[in-house]
Amino acid sequence: EEVSNGQEHTEGMXQGEXNXIXVEEHHEGEKNSHLVGKDEEKKLFVGALSEHFSKYGEIEGINIKVDPVTGRAGEHVINSKAYFGQFGNIVEVELFDKTKARGTRGGQR
């Protein structure tokens, strides 16, 4: 993995392959061309996904989380369709509503 602060990490895959993924973390106040006009505390961008996911075939679905307070997800749905559409046909997009999905998340508390 290549991290935006310049550090580079390589993680071996099960078949011995190495996969490079660029990760950028954007903090509030930073101005980037794709964040202009957005009031976001943090953004995470993971690139080089086409090489990684293309070996698995067509994308059948995308699960997008909706903020229960702001209800924001519309712009992310549009951007996700355009972005993931370049890797193949999108069969389904599902919005994740945190208020309806109250599970144990891997254990009891």
UniProtKB/Swiss-Prot annotation:
Tell me where in or outside the cell this protein is found: Cytoplasm; Nucleus
Superkingdom of the source species: Eukaryota
Please give the InterPro entries that the UniProt record associates with this protein. RBD_domain_sf
Q: Name one GO cellular component term.
A: ribonucleoprotein complex
Print the keywords alphabetically. Answer: Cytoplasm, Methylation, Nucleus, Ribonucleoprotein, RNA-binding
According to the UniProt entry, which residues carry Asymmetric dimethylarginine? R102, R105
Q: Which residue stretches belong to region Disordered? A: 1-36
UniProt entry tagged with the keyword Membrane: no
Please report the stretch or stretches of sequence annotated as the RRM domain: 40-50
Cytoplasm as UniProt keyword: yes
Q: What molecular function terms (GO) are annotated for this protein?
A: RNA binding
What SUPFAM superfamilies has UniProt attached to this entry? RNA-binding domain, RBD
The annotated regions of Basic and acidic residues compositional bias extend over: 23-36
Q: What is this protein called?
A: Heterogeneous nuclear ribonucleoprotein-like protein HD40
